[in-house]
Design a protein with these regions (language model features):
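Extended alpha-helical "rod" scaffolds
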Residues: 1-234
């Protein structure tokens, strides 16, 4: 549909105008509008089932009683933890989408992944806003920050302004549901959290290599001391 809209149809219209010495301005605009609507419908028909699946995965993961375990005696800090299982489920689902799209219509892959990344961030903030999660404890705050940040850094090549803004809003939602002691501890643990994220990026760079083909800098904004924030360090 994309090729038909951007290449085939304009060529046919130009050829018709040339052969018959007529201008089809109004007709061309109507055709473009119809093709744009068809393209959007086809695109949604493909991405919506994936977005719905991602939303269900995120909700079940975050609402699970085992989502954010308290640190054990063997852990060096409360930030010393792994991303939740739902994070890897979502990312592996997107690997499959990437593979399907790349093998059938490679030019559409970035558009599809950007759309699904936006859907992912939307599902995250909706889940964190839920009354089911009325308050956020320190382990939950650390787990949420790690989960969001790891997904954002892994999918940094497909970030958008909208997704980046939602990521920032997620941290505000979490901040509103936690207490001051947890906020202070989060700031103290940011160095450890960055170390964990670096280890995770190195450990999964082969597993999620398909997402790193397009290099872009800057995704979201992980909360930092004095309002300073950063995301997407590689």
């Amino acid at each position: 549909m994309s090729a038909f809209q951007t290449e085939i149809t304009p060529t046919l219209l130009n050829l018709f105008e040339t052969l018959f010495s007529v201008q089809l301005t109004d007709e061309t605009n109507r055709i473009r509008d119809v093709l744009s609507q068809l393209d959007a419908q086809l695109f949604r028909s493909y991405t919506k089932p994936h977005a719905t699946k991602i939303h269900t995965t995120i909700e079940s993961g975050i609402f699970s009683p085992t989502w954010a375990p308290a640190p054990t005696a063997a852990q060096k800090s409360v930030a010393d933890r792994d991303p939740s299982p739902y994070v890897f489920t979502v990312l592996l689902d997107l690997v499959i989408v990437h593979t399907e799209s790349s093998t059938t219509s490679a030019p559409l892959t970035p558009r599809i992944l950007r759309s699904l990344f936006e859907s992912t961030t939307t599902s995250l903030i909706q889940t964190f806003q839920s009354n089911i999660l009325s308050t956020v404890s320190l382990p939950q705050l650390m787990q949420a920050t790690l989960d969001v940040e790891f997904m954002a850094q892994t999918l940094a090549s497909y970030t958008t302004d909208a997704a980046s803004q939602v990521q920032t809003d997620i941290y505000q939602v979490l901040d509103q549901k936690t207490d001051n002691a947890a906020r202070v501890r989060l700031q103290e643990e940011l160095g450890n959290l960055r170390t964990v994220l670096k280890r995770l990026r190195e450990g999964t760079k082969v597993q999620f290599a398909c997402f790193r083909r397009v290099k872009r800098t800057g995704t979201g904004q992980m909360p930092g001391p004095g309002g300073e924030e950063e995301r997407g360090r590689r």
